[in-house]
């Protein structure tokens, strides 16, 4: 075999021409100590706060404490694989999560990896978990209603798209139930729902997933789960990951409902991380920036201006109180950040009044502007009568000889309380709620026994649906005009004749 010298030289020339010199500079450091999910790293001189770090064995971390001679980082994975002396590389990227339509119907962890065994998720975009909230000019006031399907809420503490409404109460008072019912009620409303489970039991998350799947609600829902068995950094990240995914849809002009269940456990996870990072503790051993932790998260809920597509994120954070103590540190923080709160009482829950919402101390500071006219017409009277009833009930315990008017008011109050009761997973359409409130405040239930009120309500609504177009008219007009009211009165009178 003859090798010609010119052939060899042409190959060498070609290789020299194709050679591209590239220099990749990577910032790296060394692990000084590791333990409790925290690593102290020497080096990494140009690292950013919140930057993603690469440890050996594919384990990732996040830089949080940038100190004079070392970096404190939290480990987002199996910390037992990391040892002293390991090399750590800075990636130059902040922590981001995948966002896209493919996430709908899936259960993911705080890093955006699927944990439901349904295979990979293919997305076109990554969203940073920490991001500045929309500015003042970019927003518009809350004006569209977000119907929860729960009579007590839609009537007395209405929620609008772009609002932050806190759900607060002791454990086992039905906080999550309200959130899940709200997700169920968004079916067909073109609202994407994100349920963020922070520090929940795995069995609880599985139960919620099954219920939403059975009812066909996972088609528009994403579950972000950082369960109790996961490390504090992942529980800390979960709500930010959830809202980052929500922002992807909001920027496309869509409406999003996000539930944080619950922020008490989120604050505990952050406290654990902060203490391990040697940050100075404050009240109840929480770090000084625990208010900012929740304010920067909840400020990302917004109703964008029409120029920016008019999308919205509505946030329903949940807070668990201890023995009804609303004046504790975290509850007062979140109450002051949000636009109102729905207060659940164990006393009401145990007495069989469910959902156990105390309408007297529950408020919605901006939702009133978003209520439909028909609901405003009937619900304002309900709230007033309920407040008077609660007051009279206290007096009635002491005095036995009550006058006729007081007795009548108490009887009306009993019927209002009965109308407000609602089984779980049975959200009410807004037009049905309007009729329910209308019959109770206009005295159509005064001659019906309290024990038969709910049966009367159900059968009347079925009768109206089958024999009239009143419900459709309320839904279309969104108001109760004189003609419609006359029709409704007539139908109620006709139905009463056949009700036994």
From Swiss-Prot:
Q: What class of enzyme is it?
A: translocase
Q: Which GO terms describe its cellular component?
A: plasma membrane; proton-transporting ATP synthase complex
Mainly localized where? membrane
Q: Which keywords does this chain's UniProt record carry?
A: ATP synthesis, ATP-binding, Cell inner membrane, Cell membrane, CF(1), Hydrogen ion transport, Ion transport, Membrane, Nucleotide-binding, Translocase, Transport
Annotated residues that bind ATP are located at 169-176
Which Pfam families does this entry report, sorted A to Z?
ATP-synt_ab, ATP-synt_ab_C, ATP-synt_ab_N
Gene3D superfamilies registered for this protein in UniProt? 2.40.30.20, ATP synthase alpha/beta chain, C-terminal domain (1.20.150.20), P-loop containing nucleotide triphosphate hydrolases (3.40.50.300)
The chemistry this enzyme catalyses reads: ATP + H2O + 4 H(+)(in) = ADP + phosphate + 5 H(+)(out)
The site (Required for activity) lies at 362
What Enzyme Commission number does this protein have? Answer: 7.1.2.2
Oligomeric form and interacting partners: F-type ATPases have 2 components, CF(1) - the catalytic core - and CF(0) - the membrane proton channel. CF(1) has five subunits: alpha(3), beta(3), gamma(1), delta(1), epsilon(1). CF(0) has three main subunits: a(1), b(2) and c(9-12). The alpha and beta chains form an alternating ring which encloses part of the gamma chain. CF(1) is attached to CF(0) by a central stalk formed by the gamma and epsilon chains, while a peripheral stalk is formed by the delta and b chains.
Protein name according to UniProt: ATP synthase subunit alpha
Taxonomy of origin reads: Bacteria, Fusobacteriati, Fusobacteriota, Fusobacteriia, Fusobacteriales
């Amino acid at each position: 075999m003859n090798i010609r010298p010119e052939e060899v030289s042409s190959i060498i020339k070609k290789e020299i021409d194709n050679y591209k010199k590239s220099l990749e500079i990577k910032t790296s450091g060394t692990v000084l100590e590791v333990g409790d999910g925290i690593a102290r790293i020497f080096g990494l001189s140009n690292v950013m706060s919140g930057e993603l770090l690469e440890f050996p064995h594919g384990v990732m971390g996040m830089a949080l404490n940038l100190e004079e001679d070392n970096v404190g980082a939290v480990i987002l994975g199996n910390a037992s694989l990391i040892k002293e002396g390991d090399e750590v590389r800075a990636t130059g990227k902040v922590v981001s999560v995948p966002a896209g339509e493919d996430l709908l119907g899936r259960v993911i962890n705080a890093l955006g990896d699927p944990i439901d065994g349904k295979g990979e998720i293919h997305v076109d975009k990554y969203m940073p978990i920490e991001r500045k909230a929309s500015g003042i000019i970019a927003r518009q006031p809350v004006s569209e209603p977000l119907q929860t399907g729960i009579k007590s809420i839609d009537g007395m503490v209405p929620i609008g798209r772009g609002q932050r409404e806190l759900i607060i109460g002791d454990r086992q008072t039905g906080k999550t139930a309200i959130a899940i019912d709200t997700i169920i009620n968004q079916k067909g409303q073109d609202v994407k729902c994100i349920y963020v489970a922070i520090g929940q039991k795995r069995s609880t998350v599985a139960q919620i997933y099954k219920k939403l799947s059975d009812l066909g609600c996972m088609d528009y829902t994403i579950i972000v789960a950082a369960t109790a068995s996961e490390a504090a950094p992942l529980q800390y990240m979960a709500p930010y990951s959830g809202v980052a995914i929500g922002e992807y849809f909001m920027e496309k002009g869509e409406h999003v409902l996000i539930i944080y269940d619950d922020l008490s456990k989120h604050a505990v996870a952050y406290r654990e991380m902060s203490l391990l990072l040697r940050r100075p503790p404050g009240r109840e051993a929480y770090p000084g920036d625990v208010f900012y932790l929740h304010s920067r998260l909840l400020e990302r809920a917004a109703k964008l201006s029409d120029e920016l597509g008019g999308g919205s994120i509505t946030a329903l954070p949940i807070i668990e109180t201890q023995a009804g103590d609303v004046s504790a540190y975290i509850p007062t923080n979140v109450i002051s950040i949000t636009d109102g709160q729905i207060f659940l009482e164990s006393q009401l829950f145990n007495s069989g009044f469910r959902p156990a919402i105390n309408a007297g101390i529950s408020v919605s500071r901006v939702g009133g502007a978003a209520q439909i006219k028909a609901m405003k017409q009937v619900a304002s009277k309900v709230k007033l009568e309920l407040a008077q009833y609660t007051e009279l009930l206290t007096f009635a315990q002491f005095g036995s000889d009550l006058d006729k008017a007081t007795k009548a008011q108490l009887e009306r109050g009993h019927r209002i309380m009965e109308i407000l009761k609602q089984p779980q997973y049975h959200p009410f359409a807004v037009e049905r709620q309007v009729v329910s409130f209308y019959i109770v405040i206009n005295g159509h239930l005064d001659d019906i026994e309290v024990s038969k009120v709910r049966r009367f309500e159900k059968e009347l609504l079925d009768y109206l649906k089958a024999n009239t177009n009143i419900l459709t008219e309320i839904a279309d007009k969104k108001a109760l005009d004189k003609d419609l009211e006359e029709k409704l009165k007539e139908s109620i009178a006709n139905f009463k004749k056949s009700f036994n």
